Amino acid sequence: MRFRLLLSILFGFCSITVAQTSRSVHSTQLGVAHIGGLYSFTETNYLNEGAAKVQEIGARCIKVSLSLDTDNPSSKLYPFHSQWPAVETLDALADTPYYRELFARKFDTFILNAFRPGRAASYWRESFSVEDETAEEECFASLGLHLLRTYAKTNKTFIIQNWEGDWALRGCFDPTAKPSSAATAAMIRWLAARQRGISRARAEFGSGGARVFHACEVNLVRQAQVQNAPSVTTDVLPHVAVDLASYSAWDTKDSPKHFAEALAFIAKHKQETEPFGKHGVYVGEFGFPESEATPQLAFERTASLLAEAQRFGCPYAVYWQIYCNEPTSQPPKVNTDYKGFWLLRPDGTRSLICELFAQ
């Protein structure tokens, strides 16, 4: 969100099996995001406090930020009980004690919001030079190679992605804003450079236990479908052979039917790439805030959306999130002062949605 059961759900672990027409079985790994939460419970560094809570709930996939951009660097998003060292590269950031501790945890998949150091996350919208293009490729080749080498014997998967590309393309949170043709062209080049870097890292490392992929995240999908509005899905994705496409699914959270249609729409526009093939679209963010519904309704809607992601064959579906990051009152003090994007509330109680991860 902003920075900002295929008929039954098997309540057993975070990998949920569904039948597929294209192959006999496909598994959707249910994950949890931990990005920019507003409260904490322990004196553990915040990145790993949240990760430990995600593990306790039963998830084997976690989405975090690993970034040095000037908008939302990791030090800003994980501030509690943390002393972040000064580093200049993403591979150096990944090698800090906090991230080494995180990556040593028993998660199968790490989804990483990552941006090049020292620049705004969407700086390319205003200007994207040949030098920038080269720097992006080198940055992500270096990060990818570091992850592959460091975790070669672990069988862990790392997915490096942007965040909500349709907002980045517009430069604002107004869905009616029209992106410029120059911004669209720059985004294509920017994503292609990141993908080249990750592809280079894989080629240089060769085969091994760990896997690294690159994803493009989209978020304004429904309006592109029904209004033919400009979008990353229709105007960018067809032109870049990214490994995966991520859907931050807030525009269809009220309708499982529209959510399923959006997944199909994204897949229609994404180039099929190996090893995911027809299953190259995952849900990068989804859920239902408790401020808009009873806890029971929020659970039921989240379960319905998850069922559609399973039915479609998404490899991952990431619930937003472990701790809420959006206040409704300042300063937030009690549960009702937050929008309710959580698995753990500020008072320490658990959301019913945790049952989706229960053994």
Give the location of each predicted region.
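Bacterial N-terminal signal peptides
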Residues: 6-15
